[in-house]
Each structure stands twice: as structure tokens, then as C-alpha cells.
Amino acid sequence: MTQDQLKQAVAQAAVDFILPKLDEKSVVGVGTGSTANFFIDALAQHKTAFDGAVASSEATAQRLKGHGIPVYELNSVSELEFYVDGADESDAHLNLIKGGGAALTREKIVAAVAKTFICIADGSKLVPVLGAFPLPVEVIPMARSHVARQLVKLGGDPVYREGVVTDNGNVILDVHNLQITNPVELEAQINAIVGVVTNGLFAARPADLLLLGTSEGVKSLKAE
């Protein structure tokens, strides 16, 4: 199976998982990226089964609206049963690295509100130790050099993602060469740097369920 076919399979598996638990008042949190796009397209086949969605990026909001799915502001929603999103890496504890698409801050906010965070990914994203994928950090623009110096002190090699401005008007530093053996601690350390909005470690609030597309089919993993 191609990578896109694996993504399509996990996206469909996520829809199959949440659909029986939705009703006409349900609002679904939806992530950002290529795998999340497959989820949106699969979910759209059942748009009468739920009320609408909260989007983690402008791009996701546009795709949802294109399918005729109502998109709500998070501030107007009292609860989210599910948040479904992809990841750049996951470990066996379902700690994630996200933010390859630069939507990490809004993704993290929506994930924090959701009762159940379902991560969907192809099998290549499951790794023994996080950090081979550079860790994205969203930064207030004027603090970019200061934050980069602090990230070097933490052992990383930050690279400015040129030409990228987040939906929040900020910039991204991608931190290379990190061996992330304690993701919860590192997430807190980076977020404590003045000028950091947030970073792409989802460890304080990891995924609850990982649906992994493999050549043998979709595997369902809960945190070890």
C-alpha cells in the first residue's frame, strides 16, 4: 500500500470509531495536514450524523466548509467529544511530535479541550524515541534569536523555517538533533522560555488512541 492509501485507511478507521458515538449535537475537533484531510473527506460522507466541527487551522476550516460541514469557534463550544489529528512522530506512550504543518498551537488547544484525542498516522510515524523529526517551536517574531539561543542550551540545533507565518502571526523554529527521552519535561522546559508560544511536543496531553496504518491493516494502540 502507498503512504496515501495507509493514511486513507486510518482516516476511515477513525470515522468508523467515532461515528457510533456521535449525535446531532456533537461537535468534532479536526486537525491539520495530509492525514487529517483524508479524515475530513471520509467524515463528510456522514455530515448529517453530527452538528459540526472545530478546526485547528484556517486550511482545515476551509476544507470542512467546502464539504458543507459547519465550523464553530472553539470559544462557542462547551465540550468536544473527539479530536482527530495526524502526527509527525509518536512513541509507544503516545507522546507525539506535531507541527510539521505549522498549526501546532491551535492543534494543542483543541486537543486540550477534547475528551478523547485520536491520533491517526501511517506506520512509519511510530518510533522508539522521539526527535528524529525536527521539533517545531512557535515563537513570537521579535524573540526568535533569543529563543534559538536558549534551545541551543537545551542541546538542540534550531533552524528558522523561512517564509512560514503561522495562523497566529508567529514564526517557527525547527529544532534538530534532539534525543527526547523525557518528552513531558522537555515540553515544559521549552514552553518556559520567554517568547515561546508552544512547542510541538504533545506529552503533557498525549493522544488517547493511536490508529496506525500498516500493510497488515489498521492497528489500534493505547498508551503503554
From Swiss-Prot:
Its EC number is 5.3.1.6. Keywords: Isomerase. It comes from Pseudomonas putida (strain GB-1). Belongs to the ribose 5-phosphate isomerase family. It is an enzyme of class 5 (isomerase). InterPro entries: NagB/RpiA_transferase-like (IPR037171), Ribose5P_isomerase_typA_subgr (IPR020672), Ribose5P_isomerase_type_A (IPR004788). Substrate binds at residues 32-35, 85-88, 98-101, 125. Coiled coil: none annotated. This is Ribose-5-phosphate isomerase A. Catalyzes the reversible conversion of ribose-5-phosphate to ribulose 5-phosphate. Pathway: Carbohydrate degradation; pentose phosphate pathway; D-ribose 5-phosphate from D-ribulose 5-phosphate (non-oxidative stage): step 1/1. GO terms for cellular component: cytosol. It comes from the Bacteria. Homodimer.
